[in-house]
From Swiss-Prot:
Motif ('KMSKS' region): 243-247
PANTHER family: GLUTAMATE--TRNA LIGASE, GLUTAMATE--TRNA LIGASE, MITOCHONDRIAL-RELATED
Organism: Burkholderia pseudomallei (strain 668)
One GO BP: glutamyl-tRNA aminoacylation
Subcellular location(s) per record: Cytoplasm
Binding site for ATP: 246
Protein name as it appears in the record: Glutamate--tRNA ligase
Amino acid sequence: MTRPVRTRFAPSPTGFIHLGNIRSALYPWAFARKMKGTFVLRIEDTDLERSTEASVDAILEGMAWLGLDYDEGPYYQMQRMDRYREVLAQMLEKDLVYPCYMSTEELDALRERQRAAGEKPRYDGTWRPEPGKVLPEPPAGVTPVLRFRNPLTGSVVWDDAVKGRVEISNEELDDLVIARPDGTPTYNFCVVVDDLDMGITHVIRGDDHVNNTPRQINILRALGGEVPVYAHLPTVLNEQGEKMSKRHGAMSVMGYRDAGYLPEAVLNYLARLGWSHGDAEIFSREQFVEWFDLEHLGKSPAQYDHNKLNWLNNHYIKEADDARLAELAKPFFAALGIDADAIARGPDLVGVMGLMKDRASTVKEIAENSTMFYRAPAPDAQALAQHVTDAVRPALAEFAAALKTAEWTKEAIAAALKAVLGAHKLKMPQLAMPVRLLVAGTTHTPSIDAVLLLFGRDVVVSRLAAALA
């Protein structure tokens, strides 16, 4: 294909947008970037009952968070109604469509008869004009729908980039309604006009659209358009093997941000959820774009794996700038009741991020594990009784005294600890555990010297002294 590459993401703003939905934006975005093409955003908002502005905002917010920038749009189908009506008028003039007066009740009865006879239920062409055919008299007071004259013979064939060669006999397709009685165009018609007007060369979308494709190709050809390359992506399954959906517990795209995931981790994970480049699991956005192709799109449904996403997010957290993590963590601290003033009074937040991030799967988890730095210690009574014994108190007092004059470095703190351990013939946990409890309020911390360094000399010495008084 010699035309400049133009791809599109065309969501319906009817509610929830999850990873399975946004993947249909990621792949066409990546292909357009790889091919130095154009990525178009189109909002298919003709379902007036279900389309909402909040859903549009969720789509735009999710794309922006993942860095899926678009070159054109967003185009809104409801703002293109005049164009659709213009094309409908042209098709009427060229006899490509015809009015059909069959009522819903008549169509339902027809389908029931067909099912009873073991036939595929479909419109039978009652109102389709043919040479020598006498049409029924139009019923009074009935406004017709417009149906597309689908070819009666031959097949629709396309080479799908995922599914391979697909061939559908035109005998399987009835004459599609492309305009309702009130004149509003239907989904399949609007899509074709949009793809034609916008010069879309590659349609990369979920395989729930594959049944629409032969109908859209026939309409496109009737309008003189060039058929794009189609790539129908297998569905995304949840961890239970069901189709990913809100009903089955899927999280919204922005829900991942709100749970403390980094966009680069989600993008990396999403890229691998239906595409591969050898055994590569971790790659940057730039590397993904460089590698992306249609040939390596998966042909089987991809299954969401939350543990794998956590593993990836942990990798990106460890690689992330500590100052960036500190900013991202602040809302999570606030949700835990630790406000900006409390953070300002406590240890350097950037330093806390650097110490605590390696063990965390999410930024939220970093905040949860770091509350000890910004709250007064409240150790469990049973833990105190277990670790802060009369036998260890002299060693604690000696350690506290040593810290008053020691150089305040990680190495000096470790040296003071080692000296006290040797003098009192104690093992590391016998002294480190009570120190952790008395200073941090918990025995679960990273290395004791690093933790004490962040708390600062004054806090450490005063908390040990208060506990030993």
